[in-house]
Amino acid sequence: MDAQFSLDTKIKVGIIGFGRMGRFYWEAMRKSGRWEIAYICDTDPTTRELAKKISPESLVVENDQKIFEDESVQVVGLFTLADSRLEQIEKAIRYGKHIIAEKPVADTMEKEWKVVDMIENSNVLSTVNLYLRNSWYHNLMKEYIQKGEIGELAIIRICHMTPGLAPGEGHEYEGPAFHDCGMHYVDIVRWYAESEYRTWNAQGVNMWNYKDPWWVQCHGTFQNGVVFDITQGFVYGQLSKDQTHNSYVDIIGTEGIVRMTHDFKTAVV
């Protein structure tokens, strides 16, 4: 398949899954002016009615097969729950559609590796929602590192704790917190280090006696000697009257530090 897109031509896309994340993508695509949102698919009737109301130019469907069979559709956005992602990615490859996928790319590690193998052996372009690499604050911090302002990079510490979804609140197919949200930080730490992971140790807490850990702390090293420390969980005071967050990045070098705090409204470097 020809993967070249003209800047003057809108990219024709079908959105599959129009829940919270699907609507975020729809909004971003509308704002960019680069996309023709030809289809919106969702199995929920109420959600389909909402799609018809706010995106009247799109054909709203219940079954995604029509999107895959439309040869004019170049890209599919896969924003349903993780248990359906493998099947949809298989169909996208079979029908020659480029892929924008929400994370995680499947609901188990075995299926995720199957997705990786399929994509690597296909001729479609694919991307996963690991957006932190595009954020202004991470790019600014990396610029400080590249300019040598903190000396040689030595230690990367990331903490992200929120009163997010507790077990049973709609997060089951995405897996425990570290398997879903935590992958942002696994990815961004590697991006900073510019190296592959060498060693790691982790511990988790099965909050509320749930079967999976909802809080994980992982630390280790990269092949180039940089040390990392990631703390992530959805356990930060769900029942509090006034909810808060604890989100920060500390990057420590031989001659200085650069750090960022984020309260989900404002990031400060």
Language-model-detected regions and their locations in the chain:
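Contiguous beta-strand/loop segments that form the cofactor/metal-binding neighborhood of enzyme cores
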Residues: M1, V186-T266
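N-terminal Rossmann-like dinucleotide-binding module
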Residues: M1-S55
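Beta-loop-alpha module in the N-terminal Rossmann-like domain of NAD(P)-dependent dehydrogenases
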Residues: Y25, S55-M118
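Short, Asp-centered acidic motifs that coordinate Mg2+ and/or phosphate
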Residues: Y39, V75, I155
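Short loop/edge segments at beta-strand edges and connector loops
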Residues: E62, A101, V128, N201-G204, ...
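A contiguous active-site-proximal alpha/beta segment in oxidoreductase catalytic domains
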Residues: D83, A106-P167
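Hydrophobic residues in well-ordered beta-strands that form the structural core
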Residues: A101, S126-V128, R157, I230, ...
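Mid-domain beta-loop-alpha active-site segment that forms a flexible
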Residues: N129-Y137, H160, G164-N201, N209-W215, ...
